[in-house]
Amino acid sequence: KVIIRKSKLSAMSTPAANNMTNTPINKEPRIAPDTQAPRDQAWQQDLAKAITGAEQGLLDLQHADGYWCFELEADCTIPAEYIMMMHFMDDIDTGLQSKLAKYIRSKQQSEGGWPLYLYGKFDMSCSVKAYYALKLAGDDPEAAHMRKARELILQHGGAARSNVFKRLALAMFQQIPWRGVPYLPAEIMLLPRWFPFHLTKVSYWTRTVVVPLTILYSLKAKAANPQQVNVRELFTLDPDKERNYFPVRSRLNWLFLMIERAARHLEWAVPRRIRDKAIKRAHDWFVERLNGDDGLGAIFPAMVNAHEALALLGYDKDHELSKTTKRALEKLLVDRGDMAYCQPCVSPVWDTALASAALLETGDERTRTHLKSACDWLVERQLTDEAGDWRDIKPDVPGGGWAFQFANPYYPDLDDTGVVGWVMHDLDSDAYKDSINKAARWISGLQSKDGGFAAFDADNTHYVLN
């Protein structure tokens, strides 16, 4: 995410950063002409003009509270999922749906598909979701753009070749049988820590996405789908006759598939009281982490699963939890007037840290007030005593990290924390000494046994689960 200057790494290397001294902002520009390069005066003037323009551009975009937060645009999977969520819930905002659909159409490539990134290659899962969302929004399947998309999807093997998350959505919309998706029973919530699979052994985003998903799987969720829109035309073989939803890629993969198949065949034997206990534990786990209007894990996939799981568990749309999950999803929307899209999350802490680091590099004393405002805003968002999943492995380490988003207390990360600490140290290490020391202690405390550092948890090296 960022190029690390070695001088800053050495400054932050002590666990408590006790010997940091005041390092006022450098008044001399850090970008100087290379004496070995041609002395092109026009080039130097253009460079200086670009730096000045970028500096002013950042200052103009700083929020009054001190932070920066830019749009976080992703691929069309997320706006497509937003449309599908509205049809799953039978809670359709037709105006918003029209704007989302227009955005999705605007991103379709000339050959008919949708990529995962700008100018990327065709992606099956993204294209299937985009096609389904457009059909739900009312696009005629015989329209030119829909025909092109459908033909390309079929050329690549059809919707059965989608990834597991897309197939889960297809199962919930009753387009494929549930045997076409991974076995995700809520009983995984009851597994002991020593078991090969445990929530602490997967990434935070996997936890927050999968836990509500186990409820959707266990109760075999069915989308309301009020217009009963289907996409059977995207399959090369009747989905009920398809036998190759899980192609074997390796011996280890084959072993996992055999274990999963055996467990699936024994699902009927799970006592109802065990299933109910597991669903309740999954419910309690994600409700505890709902995170208010900032949402579960502060990421869209987890938030939408939580919203749908609450509905499946019988929560009325006017229940406070349901209203909270809906508001969290709505906060991710970006409305551009005639079209709209949904962000995967927001990034104010990261944007503020990087913008501040860039402004520090200019050496311009005029930015000090802006940088102090940014660092003061960051101080208020440092996570110290809050509960967090990272404490499962390191319960005795004092808090001191920052999360990526406005609020995500369960999931601070080491890369945001490191960059924020460097920025504070560069600006005024005396003024921000307390925050810097807390950050350094937290980073040091989350070092893994093998010597490395991960983003969210120590010792999360269970690579076989990949």
Positions of PLM-derived features:
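Short, low-complexity, intrinsically disordered N-terminal modules
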Residues: 1-3
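Preference for long, amphipathic alpha-helical scaffolds in soluble/luminal domains
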Residues: 5-8, 12-466
